[in-house]
């Protein structure tokens, strides 16, 4: 992604003398107290590096398909029905199940995605203290950044195959472990070992799902080196 602009950040609000060698941009919407043109109403800024992004569906947006529609992966901003994402995992999964007896109902899938998001929120808010992860997931008020639920939804079709012929409750636990593994591996600023990471080496099926989830998630990120 090319630079659209950069904000000067004061020390103590994300500005540093030395650049982070592995910075992943995380955008928040800029709030203005005066009426603005529509083009200025969708300006987001990364307070980690100062870059800003105009979220208007242009080529600078990273459009992804979620269970609720097309959003920009950089901001979580809903783009409406007229935009086409480059990757369409939800469309693909619907096409794959058209000729199958067991089809996924939209309400059922939506419920599963919300369950995963809620569990991830509580886990990373209460139990995870790994440097870099909390900052990437939560804003200054402790709420999930809007693009995180969108990314959870975006990669969820990778997990649907695990639910076939298995107890949903047990599979949700596995899926949560996979998400925790993927999120920590992407956002942690240091190498992490131990129980926090999903032990997938003995299960090639889970390992393949985790790899695909990570690839999809990483494909949406703006990385600064």
Curated annotation (Swiss-Prot):
<comment type="function">
    <text>Part of the viral pre-initiation complex (vPIC) that is responsible for the expression of vPIC-dependent late genes. vPIC is composed of at least BcRF1 that binds the viral TATT box, BDLF3.5, BDLF4, BFRF2, BGLF3, BGLF4 and BVLF1.</text>
</comment>
<dbReference type="InterPro" id="IPR004289">
    <property type="entry name" value="Herpes_UL92"/>
</dbReference>
<protein>
    <recommendedName>
        <fullName>Late gene expression regulator BDLF4</fullName>
    </recommendedName>
</protein>
<feature type="region of interest" description="Disordered">
    <location>
        <begin position="1"/>
        <end position="20"/>
    </location>
</feature>
<dbReference type="Pfam" id="PF03048">
    <property type="entry name" value="Herpes_UL92"/>
</dbReference>
<keyword id="KW-0244">Early protein</keyword>
<comment type="similarity">
    <text>Belongs to the herpesviridae UL92 family.</text>
</comment>
């Amino acid at each position: 992604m090319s630079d659209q602009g950069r904000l000067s950040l004061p020390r103590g609000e994300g500005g540093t003398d030395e650049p982070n060698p592995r910075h992943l941009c995380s955008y928040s919407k800029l709030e203005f107290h005066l009426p603005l043109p529509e083009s200025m109403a969708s300006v987001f800024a990364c307070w980690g590096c100062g870059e800003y992004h105009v979220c208007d569906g242009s080529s600078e947006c990273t459009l992804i398909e979620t269970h609720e529609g097309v959003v920009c992966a950089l901001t979580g901003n809903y783009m409406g029905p007229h935009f086409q994402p480059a990757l369409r995992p939800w469309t693909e999964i619907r096409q794959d199940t058209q000729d199958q007896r067991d089809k996924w109902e939209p309400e059922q899938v939506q419920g599963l995605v919300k369950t995963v998001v809620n569990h991830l929120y509580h886990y990373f808010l209460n139990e995870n203290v790994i440097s870099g992860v909390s900052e990437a997931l939560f804003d200054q008020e402790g709420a999930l950044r809007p693009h995180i639920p969108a990314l959870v939804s975006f990669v969820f079709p990778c997990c649907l195959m695990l639910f076939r012929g298995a107890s949903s409750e047990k599979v949700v636990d596995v899926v949560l472990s996979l998400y925790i593994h993927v999120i920590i591996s992407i956002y942690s600023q240091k190498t992490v070992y131990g129980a926090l990471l999903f032990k997938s080496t003995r299960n090639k099926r889970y390992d393949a799902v985790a790899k695909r989830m990570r690839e999809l998630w990483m494909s949406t990120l703006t990385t600064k080196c």
